[in-house]
Amino acid sequence: MSRVLLVCPEPLGHGHPAGVGVRFVEIARVLLNDGHDVLVLSPDAGKVDGCRADHLSHESFAAHSVASDVAVVQGHVANAFFLHAKPVPTVVDLYDPFIIENMNYWAERGAEVFQYDHLTLMGSLVRGDFFLCASEAQRLFYLGLMVATGRLNPMLFERDPRLESLIRLAPFGVQAPRPLKPQSSHDILFGGVYDWYDPVRAIDVVARVRESIPDATLTFTRHPNPDITPQGKLAEAIGYAQKKRYDFVRFEPWAAYAERAEYFEKFALALLTFPRSLETDLSMRTRIYDYLWCGLPIVTSSAPGTDELLVRYHAGTVIHDDAVEHHADAIVSILRERATFDAMRTGAQQFVREHQWDRTLAPLREFCRAPRFEKTKELFASQPAITERPPSILDRLRRRLRA
């Protein structure tokens, strides 16, 4: 079996991983179960049971890459990895289209974020050997970029017209099925708030729901890594709830990963509201998988990836406009009609059975059994410079204030 090096950009030791951290934890578990020797690098050297762990650093990249058969990287940490690691077959996980997500932070952080995101993505596309993404829409998006960089080239196309040796679908997954507990509450979960969501609309939706179901509540959760994830929309939601004096809106800590099922099971239903954009066309919502895992029916704004799952498994209701009353009517209907509620929970259980991590990560498992360099990657692609972003003035000021 292979010696696998996982390069995770998010802390794991606090036990409260968000989407990227969760994905790396589950990748580690699946590859460990396959018999591989797994080493996880992260900012805090957080441990995953059965795997070795170390800190992210220039020295650890160099030392551990020499002793590895394959590496898996994601996001901006790829810059330092490709700069300091020794050559090793490298899987680049593109499930999170960060270059599109982070465009929401333009007003707050300026052009620097996009410039660095662009440099990171282009460098990763040129230097990676195999790529993972979460949906067919993402796959076409990244293939377009690969044509532009020269990674999708005539030699590769002639050998593999479907390009499955270059990029494959490996969406999020869920853990083993859980028995569903009886549910009688009217508590509604939104979850974490990122700047591409519309939490104020969600608050207005539940305010309208309360006209029919007076004990309905709405819960948001605070991000475990606020220093690396701007929280402008969360602040907006807090201010709006305070202004309206809504005591049914709650803001709670992020649930520990090992305890999140018990936390989610307190809720009757999940709600997601967001404006339609390229980000919604490309993203696959991590929380959708967890909510379905715990049997929560979902009412959500329309996004292609989410729509397809909820429709296929009859596990929720998709609202194709921004109307507060349409979201609210859907929630009231689900909570009041037990047959509809139970049918959606049954659909969620079917989803869980078909989206176990060992199935969704099958392309990665296959690559790790026989790692390889992509021999055509240097023949047509231009090599952009690799730059590790220096701390901005704002970043330095934040660190000084926290010290």
Sequence positions of predicted segments:
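N-terminal subdomain of nucleotide-sugar transferases
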Residues: 1-45, 201, 208-211, 391-403
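Active-site proximal beta-strand in glycosyltransferases
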Residues: 4, 85-108, 113-115, 125, ...
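Conserved donor-binding/catalytic core segment of Leloir-type glycosyltransferases
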Residues: 5-8, 171-198, 202-210, 218-222, ...
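Membrane-proximal helix-turn-helix segments that form the acceptor-binding/catalytic region
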Residues: 111-131, 139, 155-161
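C-terminal amphipathic helix plus adjacent low-complexity
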Residues: 162-163, 350-403
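Nucleotide-sugar-dependent
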Residues: 197, 256-263, 270-290, 300-308
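Nucleotide-activated donor-binding/catalytic signature segment of Leloir-type glycosyltransferases, i.e.
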Residues: 222-224, 231-264
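Conserved acidic donor-binding segment of nucleotide-sugar-dependent glycosyltransferases
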Residues: 312-313, 317-324, 333-338
